[in-house]
Amino acid sequence: MKPNFALNLTFDGIGLLHRVPSGWHLVGEVSLEAEDLGAALNVLRKTAAQIDPSGLRTKLVIPNEQIKFITVASHPHAGEAEVRAALDGTTPYALDDLAYDWTLEGGVLHIAAVVRETLGEAENFALIHGFNPVSFVATPDQSLFPGEPFFGLTACAPDLLKHTETVARDL
């Protein structure tokens, strides 16, 4: 399954997008400076329920400023070992403290990495406000990372998905 909503987290605010056949439709945005952030997010959540009564399940879009993007020349058969070697030492965090995705395109290895703690904070925020987060992604400029980096499932995803469902990534 692909999540029917995306919660776009930025340093200025939160946007909720609904998946439509042609891509994504903006449901609404809330400023982080909103007088009553919780109430404003509640309105977004209720609007989502009216738009799509099948249930709200979101992918969390992590701000690009929280992601380390690396591009390195590589051989055509690069794999996990090359990704970890390229990441090692580029952040103050241990490799096991990072979630990352990578793609190989034309001999160039594109890597996107984010601190797991950041993902946990985003998940907790979305859970507190009832947005049912199932996965983590980013939406960088295509020169940084071709496609949509996928940082995996949320810790709560198994509770939000049907037993037979898996989350499919957008490419």
Task: Describe the residue ranges of each PLM region.
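Hydrophobic/aromatic-enriched cytosolic interaction surfaces used to assemble or bind macromolecules
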Residues: 1-171
